[in-house]
């Protein structure tokens, strides 16, 4: 039995979960609605105030899907209830972020500003010009958009300049010592 998969997903007040016979899970909450198609090898049932995920057999691929399905449903329930936030920090001289409508404009030392359009389901928030918050209800989408922003200038190990996640620790390297 999967250690993750055997735990039921608690459904908080204000959140409704429905499962169709072909394993399409719909989660509605105060922040929005998420719909995701799950594998037919897994059984999903809504009982009382929880979602129970079970499997029919112990094949390796089904065991792997068991924990995955439970985790995905848990992420959906948390997303529509609380939402997800990824915070990015811009470190470097002249590195700035600003919002123009729903568009995020980054000055990252290139000859041109980097413009990113907000994907549906994700919104940006800029604090002090050097902190960007990516908010949304879909954990996967929030993480993907944050990774897209970060890839423009990954933190470099010598001075630590670049775009990093809020609690990310950058391994620093020693520079060259030179001749004496």
UniProtKB/Swiss-Prot annotation:
One GO cellular component term noted in the UniProt record for this chain: cytosolic large ribosomal subunit
Top-level taxon: Bacteria
Keyword Ribonucleoprotein in annotation: yes
Pfam families: Ribosomal_L6
Keywords: Ribonucleoprotein, Ribosomal protein, RNA-binding, rRNA-binding
Record-level Gene Ontology MF annotations: rRNA binding; structural constituent of ribosome
One of the GO BP terms on file: cytoplasmic translation
Disulfide cysteine pairs (residue numbers): none
Family the UniProt entry places it in: Belongs to the universal ribosomal protein uL6 family.
Chain's role: This protein binds to the 23S rRNA, and is important in its secondary structure. It is located near the subunit interface in the base of the L7/L12 stalk, and near the tRNA binding site of the peptidyltransferase center.
Assembly with partners or alone: Part of the 50S ribosomal subunit.
Protein name per UniProt: Large ribosomal subunit protein uL6
Source species of the chain: Clostridium botulinum (strain Loch Maree / Type A3)
């Amino acid at each position: 039995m999967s250690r993750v998969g055997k735990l039921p997903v608690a459904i908080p007040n204000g959140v409704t979960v429905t499962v169709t016979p072909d394993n399409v899970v719909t989660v509605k909450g105060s922040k929005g609605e998420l719909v995701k198609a799950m594998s037919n090898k897994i059984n999903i049932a809504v009982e009382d105030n929880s979602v129970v995920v079970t499997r029919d057999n112990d094949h390796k691929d089904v065991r792997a899907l068991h924990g995955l399905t439970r985790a995905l449903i848990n992420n959906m329930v948390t997303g529509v209830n609380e939402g997800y936030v990824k915070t990015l920090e811009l470190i470097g001289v002249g590195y700035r972020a600003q919002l123009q409508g729903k568009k995020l404009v980054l000055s990252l030392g290139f000859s041109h500003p980097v413009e990113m359009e907000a994907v549906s389901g994700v919104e940006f928030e800029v604090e002090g010009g050097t902190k960007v918050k990516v908010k949304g209800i879909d954990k996967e989408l929030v993480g993907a958009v944050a990774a897209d922003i970060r890839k423009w200038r990954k933190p470099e190990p010598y001075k630590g300049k670049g775009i990093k996640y809020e609690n990310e620790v950058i391994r620093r390297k020693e520079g060259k010592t030179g001749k004496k």
